[in-house]
Amino acid sequence: MAFLAGPRLLDWASSPPHLQFNKFVLTGYRPASSGSGCLRSLFYLHNELGNIYTHGLALLGFLVLVPMTMPWGQLGKDGWLGGTHCVACLAPPAGSVLYHLFMCHQGGSAVYARLLALDMCGVCLVNTLGALPIIHCTLACRPWLRPAALVGYTVLSGVAGWRALTAPSTSARLRAFGWQAAARLLVFGARGVGLGSGAPGSLPCYLRMDALALLGGLVNVARLPERWGPGRFDYWGNSHQIMHLLSVGSILQLHAGVVPDLLWAAHHACPRD
């Protein structure tokens, strides 16, 4: 991937203040670059290259995998949920790639703030749109409750998204999504004790989905493993790259659960009261 001679890279102390968010990554920072210079950084080694490619390759894979494995012809009136699911799967890696690729733009902190907001929007979309099919299927046989639950979760997501966009730190952004996670756990619990419905194998996928996402967030906040060896993980294997890989796994688990859930909802007949 890295086969061009790049510019002279900066150390942490020489990098712009808005890029000094991980004091344990000591080297490999790109200098301020034009848009074309940012694109050129796809082809030389720097400390954001792993972040760009982990989500860039995932995005390309999801663009093929998610629409092709969605049984559109069998979803009937629930086809819109297939569309929201596709957006939920594609938004996080798309926002992430743009953020990491252009974060060294010569526009400085103003451009960086917009890119960070775009990245957070991707996370907000997967947390919001990703849960709608889950709630829809869990409450498939409770039509009086389902609309209220969908609207309530959407409103909650709007509040969480705003808090994440205005959060002053990585840990604050992680906490901003806590209420959404709690709401999803409530839905999972309802399904687990028989108060909700859905495909039999989907619930374990959803539990793994949130477990991977939470683990990735905690690793990123803790700055592990680079905290144990500052400078040793500047290019490969640092906490943010680990979080990226775990988030890809989380999205795959979401997809593995939603597809059978939507198929189940399309063919299941609820018992009459």
From Swiss-Prot:
Protein name: Progestin and adipoQ receptor family member 4
Function: Plays a role in maintaining adipose tissue function through the regulation of ceramide levels. Mediates the stability of ceramide synthetases, CERS2 and CERS5, and their activities.
Main localization of the protein described in the UniProt heading: Golgi
Location(s), subcellular: Golgi apparatus membrane
Induction details: Expression is up-regulated in subcutaneous white adipose tissue of obese individuals.
Superkingdom per UniProt: Eukaryota
Protein family according to the UniProt entry: Belongs to the ADIPOR family.
Keywords attached to this entry: Golgi apparatus, Membrane, Transmembrane, Transmembrane helix
Bilayer topology: Multi-pass membrane protein
Subunit-structure text: Interacts with CERS2 and CERS5; the interaction regulates CERS2 and CERS5 stabilities and activities and is inhibited in presence of ceramides.
Species: Homo sapiens (Human)
Tissue distribution of the protein: Relatively widely expressed in a range of tissues. Expressed in subcutaneous white adipose tissue.
GO biological process: protein stabilization; regulation of ceramide biosynthetic process
First and last residue of the signal peptide: none
SS bond partners: none
InterPro entries, alphabetized: AdipoR/HlyIII-related
GO cellular component annotations of the record: Golgi membrane
Presence of the UniProt keyword Membrane in the record: yes
Membrane-spanning residues: 52-72, 79-99, 115-135, 147-167, 185-205, 245-265
Key word Protein transport present: no
